[in-house]
Amino acid sequence: MSRRGQQPPPQQQQAPPQKNQAGKFNPAEFVKPGLTEEEVLEIKEAFDLFDTDGTQSIDPKELKAAMTSLGFEAKNQTIYQMISDLDTDGSGQIDFAEFLKLMTARISERDSKADIQKVFNLFDSERAGVITLKDLRKVAKELGETMDDSELQEMIDRADSDGDAQVTFEDFYNIMTKKTFA
């Protein structure tokens, strides 16, 4: 009781940050450059779907299922590393804000891979799934580049990981993302 004989007001609990005053999820709170409200809602739906125990957090088993449903291959070691990297409160689980951060990073990675695939397809004129010397010759000519076959072959040799004189998409992706470059 206070000095005037009144009880102090009861402590008010604050709603979780992802809910608005009415207790409804407000995607606008999570929108940022490169991420629309619609995308936030899609990610929230996945989060809710895999938060099977309704705790507003996802444990390692739930995270693996969520990543798989969004089209990502997720190995156990990767899942535990993601949780370790993103679990800012040390709970061993991921809340929605942490999950959103993870998914936006993965979506960005997936989108850039799709863009690189489009560029690869421009080089792969025969749609054979590989870039050959003939393909490079054609692109160089279209771009007005005067390169002899030895220069073009050197480009292929630098990108070709298995020595078959062809550049696969994986080779091309690795070069474009600077994962390998001899």
Curated annotation (Swiss-Prot):
Plays a fundamental role in microtubule organizing center structure and function. Component of the infraciliary lattice (ICL) and the ciliary basal bodies. This is Caltractin ICL1b. Binds two moles of calcium per mole of protein. GO terms for molecular function: calcium ion binding. Pfam families: EF-hand_7. Belongs to the centrin family. Residues 1-31 are annotated as: Disordered. It is found in: Cytoplasm, Cytoskeleton. GO terms for cellular component: cytoplasm; cytoskeleton. Keywords: Calcium, Cytoplasm, Cytoskeleton, Metal-binding, Repeat. Ca(2+) 1 binds at residues 51, 53, 55, 57, 62. The keyword Repeat applies. PROSITE patterns: EF_HAND_1, EF_HAND_2. SMART domains: EFh (SM00054). Residues 38-73, 74-109, 111-146, 147-182 form the EF-hand domain. It comes from the Eukaryota. InterPro entries: CALM/Myosin/TropC-like, EF-hand-dom_pair, EF_Hand_1_Ca_BS, EF_hand_dom. Ca(2+) 2 binds at residues 87, 89, 91, 93, 98. Transmembrane segments: none annotated.
